[in-house]
Amino acid sequence: MTGPTEESAVATVADWPEGLAAVLRGAADQARAAVVEFSGPEAVGDYLGVSYEDGNAATHRFIAHLPGYQGWQWAVVVASYSGADHATISEVVLVPGPTALLAPDWVPWEQRVRPGDLSPGDLLAPAKDDPRLVPGYTASGDAQVDETAAEIGLGRRWVMSAWGRAQSAQRWHDGDYGPGSAMARSTKRVCRDCGFFLPLAGSLGAMFGVCGNELSADGHVVDRQYGCGAHSDTTAPAGGSTPIYEPYDDGVLDIIEKPAES
């Protein structure tokens, strides 16, 4: 393990009074004693070096030997002033080193839930001001108007925003049932001209539909450019279902008895 070295740190304080730099630099033993007093001699390891915080303070570092804190370091801040003959201990803290095991960054609850986490009985409310949703509108009461308006969400409190629809379309296009998937690349046939393809209503219908083939992507939203081997125009291969082979006559085999072991 490496840390700030005395040689590299001294160069940053070349213009300081010589005595002050020497006092701060020479307080390594004093810093170690402070750690020992704080946590015991078995908790402090090798000296790692010194770094300078400002014109009157420096930090001495030591390897920490504490259960559960592998890779951590003791940092002891010492301070002094020009003309002083000793340094003063300001604080002793435990800090993570370059190889320290740290807890992951805290993530707010609403950002922790991932696709596939929702289980039966779970309640998952949309986030406040969710950009995927915009307010819907009350039905007019005119049956003919409302029937047409239902396609764009009238009568619902919330409908998907243009941004939300675009996000969904991008996920579907890039997903397992998009044109870039391994299944789609394995065939020249596409869903847009398949008899099992059920187009979506509204603007998303220009790109997507639902597969109605129980042997393929049944019930999934598929891109019009997606395809598979179960396309409605797929023809059965010519010929019988199993190859025909010449009969094998096992009567021509010579049977040789294995000699008894001596």
Curated annotation (Swiss-Prot):
UniProt KW keywords: Acetylation
Keyword Acetylation assigned: yes
Keyword Acetylation: yes
One Pfam match: DUF3027
Modification N-acetylthreonine, positions: 2
Protein name in UniProt: Uncharacterized protein Rv0877
Organism: Mycobacterium tuberculosis (strain ATCC 25618 / H37Rv)
